[in-house]
Curated annotation (Swiss-Prot):
Chain positions covered by the region annotation G4: 435-438
PROSITE patterns attached to this UniProt entry: G_TR_2, IF2
Protein name: Translation initiation factor IF-2
Keyword Iron annotated: no
Xref: SUPFAM superfamilies: Initiation factor IF2/eIF5b, domain 3, P-loop containing nucleoside triphosphate hydrolases, Translation proteins
Gene3D superfamilies for the chain: 1.10.10.2480, P-loop containing nucleotide triphosphate hydrolases (3.40.50.300), Translation factors (2.40.30.10), Translation initiation factor IF- 2, domain 3 (3.40.50.10050)
C-alpha cells in the first residue's frame, strides 16, 4: 500500500492539515509540512489514537446522560405525588355509599355550633404520603352546602381560607373523620380512578421507557454504522486500486498540466478555483500546487527535477598534474581613464592602438599577445571610464596578474580605486605602473603614498607590492615592467593542460558585416582547433576560422592565447563560457535548451503580479519614461551603456532600454522605435539607407555617437525635457485699499494707492487682511481716471475690481503676482 501525504490523511479524517501534523508530532512522528509522506505504521498509530479518543468521548457523553436521567427521576420522586393523591381522594369520595351518608341522623352530624373535626394529618394517609394543599381540588371532593342537612359548604368564590402548614390540635365535640372503605378481601387493587382522569405517573414512566428505548436504539445504530464503516475500510484497503503515476516538471502551464493528466483545462481550472487560485490556461503553476490537484484527481505524482544540462560543461574536471604544462601569464591592464593604459600597451606592442580609439578613450576590451625573452605574455586592455565597470570586473576574473596604471601627475582617481577592488576581489596580484614620469609635474612618491591607504605598499618601503616607474611616451621602464611580470608569473607557477577539449571565456563579441558574428575568446585550458563544435552561452556553431591578435589565421589556439572565433550562429554575450562538445547536434540541443530556459525565466518574471506590483504599476503610470533602442558595434559597449543609462533614471523620469543589440541600425529597429515612441541610439554604428528613409518617414529621432560622454550628456538633456517645469511665484507689487465704492452692475470697486512695484491688468492678485490671505483671484478691471490701463506704477492711485469677489474693505493690502515656469535640470 502506498504512503499517504498529510493533506490526504486530513481530507479522509475531515480535519485540518495543521491538526493532523500536531497529532502526529504528539505520537512522536516528525513531519514538516502538509506535503510530507507518512509511513503506514505511523498512520495506524494515529488512527488508533483517534479512535481511542473518540470512544472515551462517547463513553463520557453516555455517562453524562445516565447521570442526568437519574437526577431527573430522583427529582420527580421527591416532588408531591399530586396526581395519585387526587385520584385517591376522588375515589374515596365516590366509593363511599350514599346510604351511609343518608342513614346517619342529621342531628348526629353537627351538634349546635360544633363544626366537623378536621382530619388529622396522620390519619387515613399512607406512610410516605404528604398532604396536598391544593385548594383547587375537583368539584366532587368539595363539601357542598346543603340547606336541608345544615352542612356548611365552602366559602363563596374568591374568599380563600389559608390552611396552616402544620397540624393543629383537635377540637372537642367534633366527630371523627369518616373512615375510608376497605377493599374486599383477597383483592389488593388500587382504588378505582374516575373515568377519564389521567394517570400522570404511568404516563411519565411510559415516556421515560420510550426515551430510554430511543437512546438505546440511537446508540445501537451508531455502533452499527461504525462497525460497517470499519468493515468497509478493511474490505476496501486490500483491493484499493493503485493511483496512476504521472511525472510532472517543476513548472508548467495549466494547459500542459491538464494534458499530462489527460483532463480538460476547464476541469483543472475548476479544481484550482476550489482552492482559491484563479488561473488561465497559459498561466504557470508550481509543482506543489500541481501535486495537490493531481492527487485530487487520483494520480500519484513524481516531480521531475529540472536538470541543468550545462552544469557538466561549466564544471572543470581536475587535470592530472603530469599532464600540466607551463602557460603564458594573462595580464590585465587597469586604471583610471586617460592615465595611459592603452599608450603603455602600445609601447609594449610597439603599435599605435590609441589613434584608432574614438577620443583617445578605449571603448572595447582588447586582448593581445607579446613575446619577451622568448616567453609569451597575454595582455587584456580594459576601459577606464566609469561606464565600463562590468568589463573591468570581467577582465579581472580571467586574469593572472593585474597591472594598475596610475598617472604620476594625477594620482589616485575613482576608477583607480575601483580597479584595486576588482583585482583584490579576484585574488589577483597587483603590479603598479606609475606612468607619465617624464612630465615636469610628475610626483611618483605622492602616488605611492596615496596607494598605501589601499593596502598597496611598495617593496622599497617594506611592503610586497611591485612598483615600476614607466613612461609610455618615452618608452622608459618597459623592459623592467615585463621582467617583473615574468617574475611574478614564475612565482605563481602558471600551468594548464593543452591536450584536452578547449575551454575559454568570451572577452568581447561583435557582428561583423562581412564575417558575421565574431567572438574574441581567451582560451584558458585545452586547445581550440578549427572545425571544433562549440557552445558559447546561448549560441553554438562550428569553428570556421581562428584569427590571432594581429589578424593572422591560425589553426589552433593554445592556453592563454586570445583569438577571434568565426562560425557562431549568433553574437554571444561578453563573459560567456566557450566549451567544445562532441557534435553539432549536442551543441544545438544545449543552446536551444538554454534559450528556452532563459525565455521561461523572463516570462515568469514578467507574468507574476501581486497587489504590491499592481500598486507599483499604478504609481509608475505617473512616471515619465524615455524609451531607447540601443545598437552598438560590440557587446561590451552595449552592456556598459545600458548600465550607465540605468543609473540616470530618477523618481520622475525613467530610462527604459526596450531593445539592445550588436550591429547596424536596421528597419526593424526603426519600426520598434515607432511603435513604442522611442529614440534610436547608435554607438559606433550607423543606420543603413533603408533604415534612414524609414526614420525620416516615421519621424524617429536617430542619434549616432562615438564617445560615451557625449551620449550620456544628450540623454540627460532629453530626460530634463520630460521633467515637469517648476512653478515660481514672482511678486509684482503691493497696493493699499484707501476707499471702496459700490456699483450695482460692477460690484465693489477698490480705490488703491500703489505702495511698491506695480499692479498689472494680467496679474493675479491676493487680498491680505490683518496679515491673512483671504482671497486669491484675477483682476477683472484696472482703471485710472475712468480709463482702462494696462498697469499702474508705484506712487499712483487706481481703481480695481476682482473677479467674483466683493468683500474688499478699507485698509486691505492687494498684492499682485505672476507664476513663472522654470525649466528643471537633472540633479
Amino acid at each position: 500500500m502506498r504512503k499517504k501525504r498529510v493533506f490526504e490523511i486530513a481530507k479522509e479524517l475531515n480535519m485540518e492539515s495543521k491538526e493532523v501534523i500536531n497529532r502526529l508530532k504528539a505520537i512522536g512522528v516528525e513531519v514538516k509540512s502538509h506535503m510530507s509522506t507518512v509511513e503506514n505504521h505511523h498512520l495506524n498509530l494515529l488512527l488508533k489514537a483517534l479512535n481511542r479518543e473518540k470512544e472515551e468521548k462517547e463513553k463520557k457523553e453516555q455517562e453524562k446522560k445516565q447521570v442526568e436521567q437519574k437526577a431527573e427521576a430522583q427529582k420527580l420522586q421527591s416532588h408531591p405525588q399530586r396526581p395519585k393523591e387526587q385520584q385517591q381522594s376522588k375515589q374515596g369520595g365516590q366509593s363511599r355509599p350514599r346510604e351511609q351518608r343518608s342513614d346517619r341522623p342529621q342531628g348526629q352530624r353537627y351538634a349546635g355550633n360544633q363544626r366537623p373535626e378536621p382530619r388529622d394529618k396522620d390519619k387515613g394517609r399512607r406512610p410516605g404520603e404528604q398532604r396536598s394543599f391544593n385548594q383547587n381540588r375537583p368539584r366532587d371532593d368539595r363539601r357542598r352546602f346543603d340547606k336541608e342537612r345544615g352542612v356548611q359548604g365552602p366559602k363563596p368564590f374568591g374568599e380563600k381560607k389559608e390552611r396552616p402548614p402544620f397540624p393543629r390540635e383537635k377540637k372537642k365535640g367534633v366527630l371523627p373523620a369518616i373512615p375510608k372503605p376497605e377493599a374486599p378481601k383477597g383483592e389488593n387493587k388500587e382504588p378505582e380512578r374516575r373515568k377519564g382522569a389521567p394517570d400522570k405517573k404511568r404516563e411519565w414512566e411510559k415516556a421515560l421507557k420510550k426515551e430510554e428505548k430511543v437512546f438505546a436504539l440511537e446508540e445501537k445504530k451508531l455502533n452499527l454504522k461504525k462497525e460497517k464503516k470499519q468493515e468497509k475500510q478493511e474490505k476496501q484497503e486490500p483491493v484499493a486500486a493503485e493511483p496512476k503515476a504521472i511525472v510532472i516538471p517543476e513548472r508548467m502551464t495549466v494547459q500542459e498540466f491538464a494534458k499530462i493528466m489527460g483532463k480538460s483545462a476547464a476541469e483543472v481550472i475548476k479544481k484550482l478555483m476550489s482552492y482559491g487560485i484563479l488561473a488561465t490556461i497559459n498561466q504557470e503553476i508550481d509543482a506543489d500546487t500541481a501535486t495537490i490537484i493531481a492527487t485530487d484527481f487520483g494520480y500519484e505524482v513524481t516531480v521531475e527535477k529540472e536538470e541543468k544540462e550545462d552544469i557538466w560543461l561549466l564544471e572543470e574536471t581536475p587535470d592530472d598534474p603530469e599532464s600540466l604544462e607551463p602557460r603564458p601569464p594573462i595580464v590585465t591592464v587597469m586604471g583610471h581613464v586617460d592615465h595611459g593604459k592603452t599608450s603603455l600597451l602600445d609601447a609594449i606592442r610597439q603599435t599605435n592602438v590609441t589613434a584608432t580609439e574614438a577620443g583617445g578613450i578605449t571603448q572595447h576590451i582588447g586582448a593581445y599577445q607579446v613575446e619577451h625573452n622568448g616567453r609569451k605574455i597575454t595582455f587584456i586592455d580594459t576601459p577606464g571610464h566609469e561606464a565600463f565597470t562590468a568589463m573591468r570586473a570581467r577582465g579581472a576574473q580571467v586574469t593572472d596578474i593585474a597591472i594598475l596604471v596610475v598617472a604620476a601627475d594625477d594620482g589616485v582617481m575613482p576608477q583607480t580605486v575601483e580597479a584595486i577592488n576588482h583585482a583584490k576581489a579576484a585574488g589577483v596580484p597587483i603590479i603598479v605602473a606609475v606612468n607619465k614620469i617624464d612630465k615636469p609635474n610628475a610626483q611618483p612618491d605622492r602616488v605611492k603614498q596615496q596607494l598605501t591607504e589601499y593596502g598597496l605598499i611598495p617593496e622599497a618601503w617594506g611592503g610586497d607590492t611591485v612598483f615600476v616607474e614607466v613612461s609610455a611616451l618615452k618608452k622608459i621602464g618597459i623592459e623592467e615592467l615585463l621582467e617583473m611580470i615574468l617574475l611574478v608569473a614564475d612565482l605563481k607557477e602558471l600551468k594548464a593542460n593543452p591536450n584536452k577539449p578547449a575551454r575559454g571565456t568570451v572577452i568581447e563579441a561583435k557582428l561583423d558585416k562581412g564575417r558575421g558574428p565574431v567572438a574574441t575568446v581567451l582560451v584558458q585550458s585545452g586547445t581550440l582547433n578549427v572545425g571544433d563544435v562549440v557552445v558559447v552561452g546561448l549560441t553554438y556553431g562550428r569553428v570556421r576560422a581562428l584569427m590571432d591578435d594581429k589578424g593572422r589565421r591560425v589553426k589552433k589556439a593554445t592556453p592563454s592565447m586570445p583569438v577571434e572565433v568565426l562560425g557562431l550562429n549568433d553574437v554571444p554575450s561578453a563573459g560567456d563560457i566557450l566549451v567544445v562538445v562532441d557534435d553539432e547536434k549536442t551543441a544545438r540541443t544545449l543552446a536551444e535548451k538554454r534559450q528556452e530556459q532563459k525565455r521561461e525565466e523572463e516570462l515568469r518574471a514578467s507574468s507574476k503580479v501581486s497587489l504590491e506590483d499592481l500598486f507599483k504599476h499604478i504609481q509608475e503610470g505617473k512616471i515619465k519614461e524615455l524609451n531607447i533602442v540601443l545598437k552598438a558595434d560590440v557587446h561590451g559597449s552595449v552592456e556598459a551603456i545600458k548600465q550607465s543609462l540605468s543609473r540616470l533614471s530618477t523618481e520622475e523620469v525613467k530610462v527604459n532600454v526596450i531593445h539592445s543589440g550588436v550591429g547596424a541600425i536596421t528597419e526593424t529597429d526603426i519600426m520598434l522605435a515607432s511603435a513604442s515612441n522611442a529614440i534610436v541610439i547608435g554607438f559606433n554604428v550607423r543606420p543603413d539607407s533603408n533604415a534612414r528613409k524609414l526614420a525620416e518617414t516615421e519621424k524617429i529621432d536617430v542619434r549616432v555617437y562615438r564617445i560615451i560622454y557625449e551620449l550620456l550628456d544628450d540623454i540627460k538633456a532629453a530626460m530634463a525635457g520630460l521633467l515637469e517645469p517648476e512653478q515660481k511665484e514672482v511678486v509684482l507689487g503691493r497696493a493699499e485699499v484707501r476707499k471702496t465704492f459700490k456699483a450695482s452692475k460692477v460690484g465693489t470697486i477698490a480705490g488703491l494707492y500703489v505702495l511698491e512695484g506695480k499692479i498689472t491688468r494680467s496679474a493675479k492678485v491676493r487680498v491680505i487682511r490683518d496679515g491673512i490671505v483671504i482671497h486669491e483671484g484675477n483682476v477683472e478691471s484696472l482703471k485710472r481716471f475712468k480709463d482702462d490701463v494696462r498697469e499702474v506704477a508705484q506712487g499712483y492711485e487706481c481703481g480695481l475690481t476682482i473677479e467674483k469677489f466683493n468683500d474688499i474693505r478699507e485698509g486691505d493690502i492687494i498684492e499682485a503676482f505672476t507664476i513663472e515656469e522654470v525649466k528643471r535640470t537633472l540633479e
